[in-house]
Amino acid sequence: MPQLPMTDSAPLPTPAPSSPAQPSAQPSLHYHLLGIGGIGMSAFARLLATRGHRVSGCDQNLGAQTAGLEAQGIPVAAGHAAAHVTEEPFGKIDVLVASEAVPKSHPELAAARAAGVEVRPRMALLGELLAAGPSVGVIGTHGKTTTTSMIAVAMYGAGLDPSAFVGGNVPEFGGNARTGTGPFVAEVDESDRGFALLGCETAVFTNAEDDHVGGELATYWSTVEEQHAGFARFVAQSGRVLFCADWPGLDTLCSGAREQLTYGQSAGADYRAVNVRPDESGTTFDVEFRGERLGEARVSLPGTHNVLNGLAALAVTHLYGGDFDRAARALADFHGPGRRWEIKGERGGALVVDDYAHNATKVASAVQAARQTGRRVRVVFQPHRYLRTQQSWPRLADALMDADEVLVLDIAAASETPIEGVHATLITDRMTQGGHPNVHYCPDRAAVVRDLRESAQPGDIIVTMGAGDVYRIAEEVVGGSA
């Protein structure tokens, strides 16, 4: 087997398949999580509970995540109140965990400080989990959730028994978190500036663009340069980095890493996907490590971006000593985390899919994945956030041009205040001016559902895209009566 590359310092030892995460030195504590129904906080809740801690939480909006937590014995209160910290039903709290985006005036934060309860930022908690033992942190503007899921699934298939912290629900794990005895695999979200204070054993760097920049959110970045410096800092504070050789500029951002490895289709990548064979439901390819063939792999999700995500997963599993063939079989059986190319069903012979794509690169990748199926591509796109739309509407419009039909909904505000002049019609007008023959602004969601139910036919693929609640349209199209 080719040797791992040497750097000025000795490379990290490859952990044995059974290497356990180091147990926390802390005694059992009572953690109270603000916004426990969120995808990240609910994952923290599950991880902390399986590590023997007492966990409680609250959220303004109760739903499937909070119901799942309560079914696991984790109490959840509706809304936010100082009494959640100082009185029953939760009892004495040792640590309150909150996002840095939560205002200091929040009643539970204020009550915790007054009572002498430790307030711990969520990124600090993630940092502790990453530092506790062998760890893999996935960073980048796009593909983090899918790549993190694929790494954890491939490692699990290879017998490495990973723990996982994922920004999406992984069917193989029954949720967004898993506790095992092997390496801890975590999605590290750059939307929280605190990520730049962290590091891990192996950083996986997918790509870098502009997102979560500007605006009023406390955790967002002032400039894209500042954000990319945060990526570079995370990499430099990690033991080694595996970065995508196909993405321009990552080599520069990774120049401070102690040990560098690359993956991609580019010539010279350490881990390389070759002989790539796409079909309507996914892609088969061969994996090489420094010119030596490791074996054949398949991702059961269409799109070139998913080849790269899957390649990263197999590379990490190989780095940690996992069996390639077992990892490849597990990866081939994986059909994605929730809201990432999630097949909702059929209507009138049309395939109905939902995808979280919400910025231009993700949208373009999702459209390309839809085209790979060979079907007529019908997209329902919901722009996400006024600021993001203001910053990128021309690119969003251009990313949608390859779809056969595009229906654009109103912008999902995501708690933002509307910005004057920023409207979904910026996207549709640009597409029309660019020559797209079948793009429509559709403020009436019920009419969209009705039209799709009536017009869906064999040979179509209907893809709902966006980070808001556009997935509900896919569910209504599939589940509604004829």
From Swiss-Prot:
Q: Name one GO molecular function term.
A: ATP binding
Q: Main EC class of this protein?
A: ligase
Does the record carry Transferase as a key word? no
Its chief place of residence is cytoplasm
InterPro entries membership: Mur-like_cat_sf (IPR036565), Mur_ligase_C (IPR004101), Mur_ligase_C_dom_sf (IPR036615), Mur_ligase_cen (IPR013221), Mur_ligase_N (IPR000713), MurCDEF_pg_biosynth (IPR050061), UDP-N-AcMur_Ala_ligase_MurC (IPR005758)
Which domain of life, per UniProt?
A: Bacteria
| Region annotated Disordered, chain positions | 1-26
UniProt entry tagged with the keyword Cell division: yes
- Summarize where ATP binds, as residue positions: G140, T141, H142, G143, K144, T145, T146
Where is the protein found, in the record's own terms? Cytoplasm
Give the record's GO biological process terms. cell division; cell wall organization; peptidoglycan biosynthetic process; regulation of cell shape
Q: Which keywords does UniProt give here?
A: ATP-binding, Cell cycle, Cell division, Cell shape, Cell wall biogenesis/degradation, Cytoplasm, Ligase, Nucleotide-binding, Peptidoglycan synthesis
Q: Name one GO cellular component term.
A: cytoplasm
**Annotated pathway:** Cell wall biogenesis; peptidoglycan biosynthesis
Q: Name one Pfam family in it.
A: Mur_ligase
Enzyme Commission number: 6.3.2.8
Catalytic reaction annotation: UDP-N-acetyl-alpha-D-muramate + L-alanine + ATP = UDP-N-acetyl-alpha-D-muramoyl-L-alanine + ADP + phosphate + H(+)
- Functional description taken from the UniProt entry: Cell wall formation.
The similarity comment for this entry is: Belongs to the MurCDEF family.
- Name of protein: UDP-N-acetylmuramate--L-alanine ligase
State the organism named in the record.
Deinococcus radiodurans (strain ATCC 13939 / DSM 20539 / JCM 16871 / CCUG 27074 / LMG 4051 / NBRC 15346 / NCIMB 9279 / VKM B-1422 / R1)
